[in-house]
Amino acid sequence: MKKSLIFLVLLFSCTVIAQSDPKVAFQKTRYELAVSCYKKADFVKALDLFSIASKIKPENELGKESIKKVDTLKTMLRKSIMDKVIGSWKMNGNQPLWSVNATNTNDTDGIDELVEINQKQILFYEVDTKTKAKKLIKTEDIKYYNKEESDALFSAIILSDGTIWNCSLNEDSDILHVINIARQTENGVEKIKADNLERFYSKVN
């Protein structure tokens, strides 16, 4: 009876290991590809791949090492984008400047929307286009959104009203694109999958 029990335990263990091998193999390929991207300085792609690897089997060594890489890369990428967005930005509308359909909601009332970004805060202003008088509308602390430790999202911020905005820059770092991707409510985070509110800002020299 005792030998039969030991045999069943060993059989079960071997079955579990066999079932998990494909996952470990896939995790290993994601990790190795992430390392390759990291060495090529493709940090955004590396972050995405390390994130995937960390979620496959978070309890093993590759999973633990991957989550460390995720944290390191998030910090690195956030510093990089922060260094570029510090300064003043004028809101252009809901589409890129080159788009023929771009609309600037400020054109009709003689008011420009301006944001000033520093290391800790975002200050929102209204500027009279005629008098150039600047009025502070609100101030938001910069708080990065982190749903999960292993999440690859590094440039999303959450505002005091619960809206979550993903931020990105163009190659020249003179156009800031923000898009409302979700909203945090009492019931949790609700993703916005269609008709997302977008804004484009141009850097003010």
Where are these regions (language model features)?
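Bacterial Sec-dependent N-terminal signal peptides
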Residues: 1-23
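Alpha-helical protein-protein interaction scaffolds
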Residues: 19-79
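Contiguous, well-ordered beta-strand patches that form the walls/edges
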Residues: 24, 94-101, 119-186
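N-terminal helix-cap/turn-to-beta initiation motif at the start of protein domains
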Residues: 74-90
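Flexible low-complexity loop/turn motifs enriched in small/helix-breaking residues
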Residues: 81, 95, 110-127, 205
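Acidic, glycine/proline-rich Ca2+-coordinating loop motifs
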Residues: 91-92, 195
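Surface-exposed strand-loop-strand hairpins of Gram-negative outer-membrane beta-barrel proteins
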Residues: 100-108
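Edge beta-strand at a domain terminus
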Residues: 180-205
